[in-house]
Every structure is written in C-alpha cells, then in structure tokens.
C-alpha cells in the first residue's frame, strides 16, 4: 500500500532544472517577476485587512506566522519577511530551497526554508497560508488542499493563485505563453491540471472555511504589466478565512 502524498515527481524534476533562474528578472522566470508585484500587493493588502494592520507601520506583520507552500526561490517570502512576518517557505524541490537560502543570506533576512511537503508539517500552525501558482502542479488536489488547510490557525486566511480551466486559458496560458510568446518553457503547464474558481471554492468549503473573494489578474500589453480584474477566465486569486 502506497502512502498518499501531494508530490508529482515529474513536476519537481522540471523545476529543479530551472531553479537557478529564479532570481534573474530577465531569465526563464521573467514572467513571474513581472507577475509578482500585483500578487504581492494583493496579498499584503488583504492580509493587513484581515488582521486589522496598518501597512505603513514599521514591521506591520511582526506578529504573523506566514507559510508559502511551493515557495520556489523565495520571491514572495522575502518581501513578507521585510514586513516583519515570521516566514516559512517550503518546496518539494531541494534546489529551489538551496537557491532561496542563498538569496536570503545575500538579502540579510531570516526565513525558515524547508525542503518538505505540507502534509509533513501538520503539527505547525500559521496565520496565513499561501498556495500561489502551485495547485496546478500537484498530483492530488483534494489531499493537497486538505494538507494546506491543516496548517491554518482559527482566524487565519489561506490564499490560492492559479489558472482557470477554460478554452481562453488554453489559448493564452499554454498556446500563447509557451508556444508563441515563449514566456515559459513548453510543458510548464498542462491544461488538464487547471482548476476553476468554483472547484476550489467547493473543495475548500467542505472544511467550513468562508470564501472572502475571487479576483482575476490580466496582462495589459500596452503597459507591459499585470493588473487586477473581474475577468477570472485565465489567471485568478481567491482567499478564504477559517473561523
């Protein structure tokens, strides 16, 4: 009998090969560097709102424990650490964690980076759980969601960012981004693994969390930047609160 786990070994090996590119804004992860400011702003605003914090204060997140699941090279962990949060970043790809640790030291920050999976640290609890651009890469979505929710404290919030399962997302996120524009390596995403907002809401709601918001994120080619939108056909973020 095989023990359940959320790891897709092919996905891990794929990102292992790319990990050294994480902190190169003009490298293979350039699209993520371009996408990062809008998701970072969204997270900071809504974390502050949920915990009634003023982002203009010095170290406004100093009493918060935050975990970023599938943290990669630490693109979200570092800015949250700078805001005073106690940040844990976990990733199943060891190379990602090594890259994140190196950059953390170069940045003079203190972040708890672990090469592990959410189901392996269920004894730890956090105020904020981040599942950003990770759910479309896991093997067992239901088990992954359950494992992530197990890490959340009462009163805490969990965020998901992923890609909707629509014809538009196939055209833009795969054909456009991978084959035409070459923003991402071919094979980065599989349309069959994309998931709709309603699917996430239904899966999370089984655990009696309250759905707070779903927001789309679209790319504006005129300004060469991402912006928030009511259009959730391709990229979107959603978050939930545990009472």
Task: List the predicted regions and their residue ranges.
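N-terminal, positively charged/glycine-rich alpha-helical extensions of SAM-dependent methyltransferases
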Residues: 1-29, 33
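Conserved alpha-helix/loop element of class I SAM-dependent methyltransferases that forms part
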Residues: 34-62
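Conserved hydrophobic residues forming the short capping helix/wall of the S-adenosyl-L-methionine
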Residues: 47, 51, 104, 204
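Conserved SAM-binding loop
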Residues: 53-169, 197-200, 238-242
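Acceptor-substrate binding/catalytic loop of class I
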Residues: 162, 182-199
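Short, flexible, mixed-charge acidic loops at enzyme active sites
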Residues: 169-179
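Short alpha-helix
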Residues: 191-208, 214
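Core SAM-dependent methyltransferase catalytic element
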Residues: 225-243
